[in-house]
Amino acid sequence: MSNEFTHINADGNAHMVDVTEKAVTEREARAEAYIEMAADTLEMIMSGSHHKGDVFATARIAGIQAAKKTSDLIPLCHPLMLTKVEVELEAQPEFNRVRITSLCKLSGKTGVEMEALTAASVAALTIYDMCKAVQKDMVISQTRLLEKRGGKSGHFKV
């Protein structure tokens, strides 16, 4: 693990990292998030009886869109040409929650960790938004990077 913040320059100011001289490599990142809810709320999602429509389909599209917009949301992120974004949603009724996983890929000069984290986070927020009329105390938690490949820092896996 590095002991330097790459987004802080010598004067202590935030700046966008210069990746001009970095090599183009295959990069991939996976992230996850969970949203916990009442059993009745989860059943409504699973059965497709939610009055707003298919919650999982909407959350999946929102996560994909969010990955593509990460540089608009996080000030020092580079705009990236993503080659793949995948968002999966898994109902876990035994825990009254939904597990969201994301995968982002590209060939580029900088990693896709923030895009994967943003995809999982926004998918969870979309579930909250669609279900808040029936339950306001849902909890989004455990958002984390699961794995990253490529680039100078190499492979990371939890």
Curated annotation (Swiss-Prot):
Substrate binds at L76, C77, H78, M114, E115. The active site is at D129. It catalyses: (8S)-3',8-cyclo-7,8-dihydroguanosine 5'-triphosphate = cyclic pyranopterin phosphate + diphosphate. GO terms for biological process: Mo-molybdopterin cofactor biosynthetic process. InterPro entries: MoaC, MoaC_bact/euk, MoaC_sf, MoCo_biosynth_MoaA/MoaC, Mopterin_CF_biosynth-C_dom. One of its GO terms (molecular function) is GTP 3',8'-cyclase activity. Gene3D superfamilies: Molybdopterin cofactor biosynthesis C (MoaC) domain. Its EC number is 4.6.1.17. Catalyzes the conversion of (8S)-3',8-cyclo-7,8-dihydroguanosine 5'-triphosphate to cyclic pyranopterin monophosphate (cPMP). Homohexamer; trimer of dimers. Belongs to the MoaC family. This is Cyclic pyranopterin monophosphate synthase. It comes from Shewanella sediminis (strain HAW-EB3).
